[in-house]
Amino acid sequence: MRAVLGDSGVDVTSSTKGAFGGDRGTSLDVRCQVTAEGRGRVGVTISGAPRPRAEYGTGELYTAVPARDTLPVPVGHGWSGLLATDNARQGDPGDGKATASVLLDCAGNGRSLLITVETTLGAATLDDPATRPSFVRTATATAQRADDRWDCGARLGKQVYDVDLPVNKDEYEPLIGADGTCATVPTAARSAVSTARETARARAPREVCALGARDGSSRYRLDAYYGPYAEDARAQYTRNDGEDVTPAEKPAGRLGQSAYWAGADCPDGAPRALYLVRADDADGDARARPDLGYERAALSAFAARSAEDHGCAEPVTP
């Protein structure tokens, strides 16, 4: 954190609750906040996973990653992690604020540690390629210490020297030729799908492919969730779904009239990966002329490629 906030004039608060381990989930919850007046704030959370089922229904299980207006990008360099922001444009209100997360899959026991760092720097801009790695290195350095402290034995990455900028809404490209998170996803004439916003693939615990029309206007969104993020997404559907059958109950299916999901078993006792496709013009309501065949085809292609990259089994699709 010194590289981000400096050495002097900082205020630190911290707390540690719960324990890492147990047959019914791990309750470990570590929080630390460092504030430097006039320079910014860094908040760190270390969460053990999976959580006890008693926590389901009490809110989000893990610190949320911004992914509504921008697409989070992978940390890379051998880490399973993300860099995310609400807005990545220089001078915009969200500039200088970022969330970095790193997932440690502990050796041989199906448990993991999720490290999340939320940073606000008043004078910094994410548009500066020198700034982004310093955000991320706070998370990777914390992950290294957490791995040793809780005897996780995870595969660690290398020093992070560069990180991509999260992808904004207007940064779309032709879907044909996509080579990242949208690779292999087909176009669709009926649904007017011909463009994509995507990120690189690098073992990130969350992946997004946003599909659009020729002018970039949104049509569909494909999401992949791994580890704690898959657990949290299923827990959200368990308590908030309002549907007959949900991802919490079956490996694949249809969410009412608005979406489909798929699932894949992953190695070393990790939670089943979750893949979702949702039309951007749907919020649970029936649509006049849904292109259901395309939605299933897009989900199948997206899930298969993502699962392969993560070493998971062939997905079960609707």
Regions found by a protein language model. Name each.
Residues 1-62, 152-212, 222, 290-293, ...:
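Extracytoplasmic low-complexity, Pro/Thr/Ser/Ala/Gly-rich segments
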Residues 17, 97, 111, 158, ...:
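Context-gated lysine
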Residues 29-123:
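Ordered, small/hydrophobic-rich secondary-structure cores
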Residues 79-152, 243-318:
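A short, solvent-exposed beta-edge/loop patch
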